[in-house]
Each structure stands twice: as C-alpha cells, then as structure tokens.
C-alpha cells in the first residue's frame, strides 16, 4: 500500500476505532476503575457517582470546541451550540440556587476561589477563613497554597471542648484584623454554618462575605441545608461532591457589578477557553438537581450520615463535634490507639474507600493524622439507606478493631472477610450496568 493510500484510510480508523482498539492500556485502566467503583463502598466525602447522562455529555463532541468569552460574546466563530449549552447551565444554576448571576466556567474549585480573590483583593490584603486544621480548605489561606502565599490569611478555628465554631470569637478576630474578605465554608466541618451572623460580622468590619459551599451545595439544592446565597456577597461551589455533577466550579452572586468582576476574573483573568464538554455536563447535572427526586436524595444523604455516625459511636468510636448535620463526619481514632494513614489502608484492603484526615488540634502530621473523614453521597447515590449504613459502620469497626488489637495474623483474615461482605452489599446496588 502506498503512502497516499495509507493517509486516505487513516481517518476511517481515527473516527471508528474504539478506545480498547486505539489504546488498550488506557482502556484497561478505565475498566479497572469501573470495577473498583462497582465493588467498593465509596465513603470519600468529596466523591460521588454521576449519572450516565452526565458521562455522555462530558464525553461528547463539545470537547472539540474552543469558546473563549461568554455566550453571545465569543472570540471564535461556530459557537452557536456551545452557547446553548452554557446558557442552559447558567439558567439552571440560577434557578437551582435562587441566584441572579452565575458563572459556570471555572474548571475547578480552586480556580473559582482564585477568581474571587482576583476580583476582590490585592496581593497582601488580609482575609479570614476557617483554619485547615479545623476543617477549612487549602484555598482558604493554607501557607502552601496561593491564597496563603499571595494574601495575608488570618484564620478562625473551633473550640477545643465541642469542636464548634465560636461566632463571638469570629467577630472578635474580624475586629482585630479588619479583613477585606471573610470566608465561611470548609472541607471537614459537620455542623451548620450561621450565614446570617457571618454576614453581620462582615458588614461590621466592611468586609465581603464569601461562602464556599463546595461540600454541601447538593444539600442546599435539595432543601436540607440552609442556603448561603441570600447572605453572601459571593457563593462558590464545586459541581461534583454532593451536587453529583462533573468535576468543576461555579460562582453565584446577586450583585451585577460583582458578577462582572467575577466574569472578568475567570476570563481573561485566570482561564482561556472554557471546557465546553464539562459545562454541558454541568447543565445536565443542574437539570437533575432541579427534579423532585433530588430532594429525596439530599434528605437521604443526611439521614444516612447520621446513621453511620451513630453506628460508629455505638461501636466505640468518637465523632468530632459529637455527630453530623450534613453529609460528612470526622472519626477520632485516638481512643482506639490508631492513626489515620494506617486505618485508611486497612479499610481500602477491605474494599471500603475513605481518606485519612486531620482532626482539630491534631498532634499528628498531615500525612499521618488522628482521624478519618467519611461521607455518604456516593453510596447514597447507588441506593444505600439507613440499614446499609448501619451495616457499613459495623464493617468499619470490624476492620479497625482488628488492627487495633495488633494481631498481625488476625487483621488480614478480618479484612478478607469484610471484603466479601462488601462485595455482597455492593452487588445488591449495582452501578453502570452494561
């Protein structure tokens, strides 16, 4: 076959070859990950399982299109259909959260928060956020993060006795440091946020209030968690986690002048062409969250979290703050003489996926930790209810009690037995069936 014939036939393969045919190594990795998700209990609080419709949108031809700018004002031609997708995403997000303005272009939670900083702060300005060690987030001023390197972060924390945020202390701290921005929200705080009081404190010192609801946005959308949107100058959230969409970010506000600042901060400030396939998938997820059954889902997420926390407490584990009012909890492992890193690995061997996590005033290093963070969104999506989460609490206790006994011969047997129980449980609630 001559070279011209080879060139002519290449497009046939390019447009028709399956992934398994074109790249068997990646296909094998994806198949392996599908198997892992099917047969493990996912308890990482920041993870969820998206619908087949979201997967289809994210894997669509929208990935081919460059669309710098915003609907109706692009720097490229041929944007009529991606404009439809982005406009649907914007309008659905506004309706879902009761906001007047929405930017659906942030590629991630970190970038959405960076956009707020870019729009509202100058390098060196002071802002306040919950300390990472108390349940905050890297982008809320951790020293290793851009937010902590470029700006002056003054953190508030939780009380030692009950691990709750002391709003009087937040007010005192704000009066002391006079921040330009105050952030409410975090990645490992299991109790309600007093958004009204946060806004009052922000107003008292002339600060903007930003609420990062990345973790509990799905609960807000489902009506089982108070909404920060009426109180905050700006609300940010990821679109995955409890919202059950593709990985990405979202910025909401009710002020047109601020909305223009945030739009400019995203493009051209931080990003170029938006990921239109992801934005299409966001639109699908927002549409799903607007349906009545999503309210049932959100209610179940919280009920399941409470059931899991109570099951663990009944098995002798301490839960930070005594329980949970949202989708997650922190387990204090110190009464069992365990550390987070060892416990995480043992549970993974038993097909229960979670993450080690620092607890407030943790004496251990971040890669060791004294705690585990557990969440219920993913397993709730696949159909687990209160009964199943009570069972999961017992399975976790079996694994951790075995390693706490320091019997090297017993622990592997327990982990293997629990793994079989997990397999039986997950088989009752299958995902992505062929």
From Swiss-Prot:
Any one GO CC term of the record: cytosol
Residues noted as binding (6S)-5,6,7,8-tetrahydrofolate in the record, renumbered to the chain: 132, 136-138
The organism's place on the tree of life at top rank: Bacteria
Any one of the GO BP annotations: glycine biosynthetic process from serine
Enzyme Commission identifier(s): 2.1.2.1
Pathway: One-carbon metabolism; tetrahydrofolate interconversion; Amino-acid biosynthesis; glycine biosynthesis; glycine from L-serine: step 1/1
Catalyzed reactions: (6R)-5,10-methylene-5,6,7,8-tetrahydrofolate + glycine + H2O = (6S)-5,6,7,8-tetrahydrofolate + L-serine
Alphabetic keyword roster: Amino-acid biosynthesis, Cytoplasm, One-carbon metabolism, Pyridoxal phosphate, Transferase
Protein localization: Cytoplasm
Enzyme class: transferase
Family, as annotated: Belongs to the SHMT family.
Subunit structure and binding partners: Homodimer.
Listed name of the protein: Serine hydroxymethyltransferase
Organism: Nitrobacter hamburgensis (strain DSM 10229 / NCIMB 13809 / X14)
């Amino acid at each position: 076959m001559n070279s011209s014939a080879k060139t002519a036939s290449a497009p046939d393969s390019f447009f028709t070859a399956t992934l398994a045919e074109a790249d068997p190594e990646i296909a094998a990795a994806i198949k392996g990950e599908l198997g892992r998700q099917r047969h493990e209990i996912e308890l990482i609080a920041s993870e969820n399982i998206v619908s087949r419709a979201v997967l289809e949108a994210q894997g669509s031809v929208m990935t081919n299109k460059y669309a710098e700018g915003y609907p109706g004002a692009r720097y490229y031609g041929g944007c009529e259909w991606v404009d439809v997708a982005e406009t649907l995403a914007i309008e659905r997000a506004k309706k879902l959260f009761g906001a007047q303005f929405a930017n659906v272009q942030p590629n991630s939670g970190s970038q959405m928060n960076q956009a707020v900083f870019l729009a509202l702060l100058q390098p060196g300005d002071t802002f306040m956020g919950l300390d990472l060690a108390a349940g905050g987030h890297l982008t809320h001023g951790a020293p290793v993060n851009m937010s902590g390197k470029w700006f002056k972060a003054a953190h508030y924390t939780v009380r030692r006795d009950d691990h709750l945020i002391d709003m009087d202390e937040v007010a005192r701290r704000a009066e002391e440091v006079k921040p330009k921005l105050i952030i409410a929200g975090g990645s490992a705080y299991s109790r309600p946020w007093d958004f009204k009081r946060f806004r009052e404190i922000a107003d008292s010192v002339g600060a903007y209030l930003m609420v990062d609801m990345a973790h509990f946005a799905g609960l807000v959308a489902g009506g089982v968690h108070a909404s920060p949107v009426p109180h905050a100058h700006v609300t940010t959230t990821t679109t995955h986690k409890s919202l059950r969409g593709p990985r990405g970010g979202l910025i909401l506000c009710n002020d047109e002048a601020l909305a223009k600042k945030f739009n400019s901060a995203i493009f051209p400030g931080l990003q170029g062409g938006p990921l239109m396939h992801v934005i299409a998938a966001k639109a699908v997820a927002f549409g799903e969250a607007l349906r009545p059954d999503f309210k049932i889902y959100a209610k179940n997420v919280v009920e399941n979290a409470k059931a899991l926390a109570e099951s663990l407490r009944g098995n002798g584990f301490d839960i930070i703050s005594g329980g949970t009012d949202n989708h997650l909890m922190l387990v204090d492992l110190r009464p069992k003489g365990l550390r987070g890193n060892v416990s995480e690995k043992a549970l993974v061997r038993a097909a229960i996926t979670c993450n080690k996590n620092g607890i407030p005033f943790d004496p251990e290093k971040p890669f060791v930790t004294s705690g585990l963070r557990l969440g219920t969104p993913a397993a709730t999506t696949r159909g687990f209810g209160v009964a199943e989460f009570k069972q999961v609490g017992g399975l976790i206790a079996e694994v951790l009690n075995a390693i706490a006994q320091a019997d090297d011969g017993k622990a592997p047997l327990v982990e293997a037995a629990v793994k079989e129980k997990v397999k039986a449980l997950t088989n009752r609630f299958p995902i992505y069936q062929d």
